[in-house]
C-alpha cells in the first residue's frame, strides 16, 4: 500500500530550527496563514514546521489545521525552492485547502527571493534557490 506521508527529513522538528527560521527568515502573509521562510542551509529540499497555539481552538481544530497545511505542503513541495518554512494561523478561522495551495505556490517563492535579495545586499553573496529543487522522490 502506498503511503502519502511527509517524511521526517522534510519536517522542522527541533526548537533550535524554529528559532533559526524566525530570526533569519522573512515573514509573509497568505490569505489565512503567516509564513516564516528562510533559505535552507542544505540545498535540495524544503522543510516544513507548523506552530499552532491553544488560542486557535481545541485540539481537534488545531490538528485539522496541521493536517491541511501538511497536505498542501506535500502536494507543492517539489515545486518550491529550497527553503525552511514555518506556518502559523493568522486568526481563529480555519483556512480553506485551495487557499493554502495557492499561498504555497505564490507567497513562498516570493519570500525566498526577497530574502535572497536582502542577503546579497548585506553579504555580497548571491544565493539562487530556484536551482535547488527538492529532488527526493515521492514516497
From Swiss-Prot:
Q: Which domain of life is it from?
A: Bacteria
The record ties this protein, via InterPro entries, to:
Ribosomal_Su5_D2-typ_SF (IPR020568), Ribsml_uS5_D2-typ_fold_subgr (IPR014721), RNase_P (IPR000100), RNase_P_CS (IPR020539)
State the organism of origin. Answer: Chlamydia felis (strain Fe/C-56)
EC number(s) of the enzyme? Answer: 3.1.26.5
Name the Pfam families for this protein.
Answer: Ribonuclease_P
Q: Which family does it belong to?
A: Belongs to the RnpA family.
NCBIfam families recorded for this chain?
rnpA
Could you tell me what reaction this enzyme catalyses? Endonucleolytic cleavage of RNA, removing 5'-extranucleotides from tRNA precursor
Q: List, in alphabetical order, the Gene Ontology terms for molecular function in this entry.
A: 3'-tRNA processing endoribonuclease activity; ribonuclease P activity; tRNA binding
**Partners and quaternary state?**
Consists of a catalytic RNA component (M1 or rnpB) and a protein subunit.
Q: What class of enzyme is it?
A: hydrolase
Checking PANTHER family in the record gives:
RIBONUCLEASE P PROTEIN COMPONENT
Q: An example of a Gene Ontology BP annotation on this entry?
A: tRNA 5'-leader removal
UniProt name for this protein: Ribonuclease P protein component
Question: Keywords assigned by UniProt?
Answer: Endonuclease, Hydrolase, Nuclease, RNA-binding, tRNA processing
Q: Name one GO cellular component term.
A: ribonuclease P complex
Record flagged with keyword RNA-binding: yes
Per the entry, what this protein does is:
RNaseP catalyzes the removal of the 5'-leader sequence from pre-tRNA to produce the mature 5'-terminus. It can also cleave other RNA substrates such as 4.5S RNA. The protein component plays an auxiliary but essential role in vivo by binding to the 5'-leader sequence and broadening the substrate specificity of the ribozyme.
What gene is this protein a product of? rnpA
